[in-house]
Amino acid sequence: MKIHRLAGYIQNIYLVEYPTKLLLLDGCCRADVDTVYQFITEHLNRPMTDLKLIVVTHMHPDHAGGAYPLRKLSGAKIAASNAPGQWYQGLDGLLMHLTDMALAWWVAGRLGKKRQNLWYNRHLTPDYYLATDAQLPYFEEWQAIHSPGHTDRDICLYHSASESIYIADLLVKVKGELMPPFPIFYPRRYLNSLLMLKTLQPKKIMFAHSDEMNLAEINFATILDAVPETPMTHWRSVKAKARRALGFKRSSLRR
């Protein structure tokens, strides 16, 4: 087994290579489809049909956006959490889907990337639904570990033989420091997911938005202190900013 890390549009892409098959640890962005295609067919000199499984760790644009196009190109199967329903369901879900793509463009701008088409289907119908601790189809040495909090359906992917784990957005790096991601819809579940990682004691941790680390490099005490007690979501953020702006305006009028 060899794990290749590719530079994606706004995140790392992890492609696991075996002699007869390939595993994509996350669904990446729609803008990353050509990157994955070229790496497999040109760098590895392998047919796209060697890609057997694409895991979608959660439904955000940089983790699910390329799943359907890559399945169409390769015939690979898609696996995702067995969380009920769709993450982006209803009118609120549609608005959140649009907001998340706008946030992805904002991140791209901060990274100096040109704006690219990130549109993808907000509803996912995977070929396999993964229960917690389930083995991945075709790749039994990999295990799906549910790690909700960021959303209700986040999963990490653990390779027990090498004691390596891909944690997607469980932690992100901002200004050189690891911290909880935005948003966090379920703070208590998120706290439990962090404790799971700490208890598991992996030797290598792979991030979507940071370089690889070992467990000793992570200051869990600081991170655990930063976990919010209430949900930290798009709408709460907008409301809080509106209240602050309104309060400032009223204060200025009183002067």
Predicted features and spans:
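Conserved beta-strand hairpin/beta-sheet module of binuclear metal-dependent hydrolase folds
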Residues: 1-43, 156-172
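Residue-level marker for buried hydrophobic side chains located in beta-strands
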Residues: 23-25, 55, 78, 164-166, ...
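Metallo-beta-lactamase
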Residues: 28-31, 141-222, 227
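Short N-terminal helix/helix-N-cap motif within the alpha/beta-hydrolase-1
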Residues: 33, 59, 64-66, 152, ...
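Active-site HxH/HxHxD metal-binding segment of metal-dependent hydrolases
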Residues: 41-127, 230-232
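Short, charged, surface-exposed secondary-structure boundary motifs
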Residues: 87-92, 175-180, 239-240
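Anionic-ligand binding region
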Residues: 126, 131-134, 144
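Binuclear metal-ion centers of metallo-dependent hydrolases, dominated by the metallo-beta-lactamase
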Residues: 212-255
